[in-house]
Amino acid sequence: MVSLIFFLLFLSCGSDSSDNGQPIIIDKKYVLPYPIGKAYTCSQGFNSSPSHLGTFSYAIDFEMPIGTLVTAARSGRIVYILESYSDNDQIDGHENVVIVMHEDSTYARYVHLTLNGALVHMNQIVVPGDTVGLSGSSGTNGGPHLHFDITKTFNGKSDQTIPFDFMNTISHPVGLQRGVTYEALPY
């Protein structure tokens, strides 16, 4: 009991950032955006070059072959679908995307889906693990992958991302790390 009290006091007095200045994520509401048992490598994490800076600071890229199943990371309602762009055109703004609004009015964005890769419809309710779409290589990118992020607003491409973590893999309180492969564990 004394240990528990000390631990809680330690948490309440601690800083809300890590030694490298990144926020420490305590609330893990999300699951990895791919099926249980599958594993993919993080090709770009939080606050990293070339593109996860500024408004995109808190985003994760997973290397995935075109056509890989992408699943809902949290319960919500489909509020936006764009799936009309071809893979590999390397044109900024041609990113196919599905956006899910959560109960707390945050938004999950599943970006770079393949042409006609949305496997949901507008206003559809999804729960963690439901199929959302198929990964791709649409828009400007360095190869086939899924770009996943969370925002508090949905006004367009430049919405500010917010920190998040996943409950069904190895915990990283400052975000997943580039070059590490993460298996989606049961939750």
Predicted regions and their residues:
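Non-catalytic extracellular/periplasmic "stalk"
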Residues: 14-40, 53
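C-terminal motif of bacterial Sec signal peptides marking the signal peptidase cleavage site
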Residues: 9-12
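Short, well-structured beta-strand-loop connectors
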Residues: 69-80, 119-135
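Structural recognition of the beta-strand scaffold that forms the well-ordered cores
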Residues: 41-43, 61, 70-72, 98-101, ...
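Acidic, glycine-rich catalytic/binding loops that coordinate metals and/or anionic ligands
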Residues: 18-23, 28-30, 122-124, 149-187
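Flexible, gly/ser-rich surface segments that form the specificity/activation loops bordering the active-site cleft
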Residues: 81-93, 130-146
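Short glycine/threonine/proline-enriched tight-turn/helix- or strand-capping micro-motif at secondary-structure
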Residues: 41-74, 81-90
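Zn2+-dependent peptidoglycan hydrolase active-site motif and core
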Residues: 73-119
